[in-house]
Amino acid sequence: MNFLQKLEHAWATQNSLLQVGLDPDPARFPAELQGRPDAILSFCRGIVDATAPFASSFKPQIAYFAAHRAEDQLEALCGHIRDKYPHLPIVLDAKRGDIGSTAENYAREAFERYQAHAVTVSPYMGLDSVEPYLAWRDRGVIVLCRTSNPGGSDLQFLPMADGQPLYLHVAGLVADKWNAHGQCGLVVGATYPNELAAVRKRVGDSLPLLVPGIGAQGGDINATVQAGANSARAGMMINSSRAIIYASGGEDWREAAAEAARGLRDAINAVR
């Protein structure tokens, strides 16, 4: 089963488009985990176990682990998800963008060391920076397209010679040329529903969209679903991180995360 098949299976069997982002910040951990050498792993594992019934994928952000010299804990976390929830894909949020042997090693890091099912990448250096990931035919490659941050407009909205904005050129390039083996997806922020709709129209049902910006960043659930869903009323990994994993800083942090995930899943399903 390749990444897209695994993701589609998770959407259907979990009845969920929710992706839980894992962005561990030890300063925000509950008191019971403070000072523990395995605090990052323990926190993320607790969040995963609490939210797995309501999620269709998980997205660990590699920088939150690397900054605390906790790559080994990320490796253990990915192993925990694969072992306990083998039906739920892991999307490693790395946003890599180099070329040649460097990119090949980044791909090995994502797919061999962490055994992620997909990874996020930057298209700025062109196909050369994406091909090393595409060589792993059963894995997903999620390409930055129209990101949720305000500064994304500095480049992504610039007009091409034919008048279309750069982000739509990227969407077309990925859909028409880079997705020969059905491996690719796009990152498109919920904070720009008009652009999200334009991307979905451009790529049709061919690509899954990873949609950050719901929750702490203020994206609207109804607008997001109406703009980004495919013809099967799926096709999206709607990501929420902080609003779920930091729903409570007290002893009820697991239960609060579960309720936040349940509530967001249900809110998404209500407008599908």
Swiss-Prot record:
One of its GO terms (biological process) is 'de novo' pyrimidine nucleobase biosynthetic process. The keyword Phosphoprotein does not apply. It is an enzyme of class 4 (lyase). It catalyses: orotidine 5'-phosphate + H(+) = UMP + CO2. Pfam families: OMPdecase. The active site is at residue 95. Pathway: Pyrimidine metabolism; UMP biosynthesis via de novo pathway; UMP from orotate: step 2/2. The keyword Lyase applies. InterPro entries: Aldolase_TIM (IPR013785), OMPdecase_AS (IPR018089), OMPdecase_type-2 (IPR011995), OMPdeCOase_dom (IPR001754), RibuloseP-bd_barrel (IPR011060). Its EC number is 4.1.1.23. SUPFAM superfamilies: Ribulose-phoshate binding barrel. Keywords: Decarboxylase, Lyase, Pyrimidine biosynthesis. One of its GO terms (molecular function) is orotidine-5'-phosphate decarboxylase activity. Belongs to the OMP decarboxylase family. Type 2 subfamily. This is Orotidine 5'-phosphate decarboxylase. It comes from Bordetella avium (strain 197N). The gene is pyrF.
